[in-house]
Amino acid sequence: MRYGENIANRVARWMMVKPDLDKPWLSVQYPNPYTKGKIVISRGARWHGEYFPWKQIVEEFKDDLVFVGLPEEHYTFCSLFGNVEYLPTKDLYEVAEAIAGSDLFIGNQSSPNAICEGLKHDCIQECCLYAFDCVFVRNNKQHITHGELSFTHGTKSFNASPSYPKHGHRIVFNNYEYKANQPHLCVAMLRADLILQGGSYSVEEMNSWVERY
């Protein structure tokens, strides 16, 4: 099991098949018209990322956001990041209809994100660094590993930089700083970015680059 390999490829290797994961494997007959022009969001209870700018997204796009998921997930999200509209769904097909009808999906590694991937819909994914197994690189998807995010929705442009701690650990790589309270998080952020870019260094080598600041 290789770090950064997605779950679909792991299952395919076990089953000795070679699916074309670049093409959609889910479809929706009637996308939900209610989510047209909106951003569908979701955040499950597990698999959270580091420094993902949820609060800034809510502040900038609150009126355009529609949350799908469990009621308790919506409650937790609003408690942490601000109130957003909730769209009740009776099953995962209704979640798929909501995502398919929207302009964009933003979410962490959860079932709505898996549905979005199956649809190959425009996506911004909050990546979990200790379970980095939902990596599907495509032109209309961003994998956010350390909070840096830029995108456009309607007439608005959004740009966010990670809110790193004032003191902690860091790795400087290609003139970019990866900062965190714990050294292993610096390594994890860099390691994830290298996988997305097609590069590779050993964990031991990256550990040697960590310094205090």
Whereabouts are the PLM-identified features?
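Catalytic machinery of carbohydrate-active enzymes
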Residues: 1-213
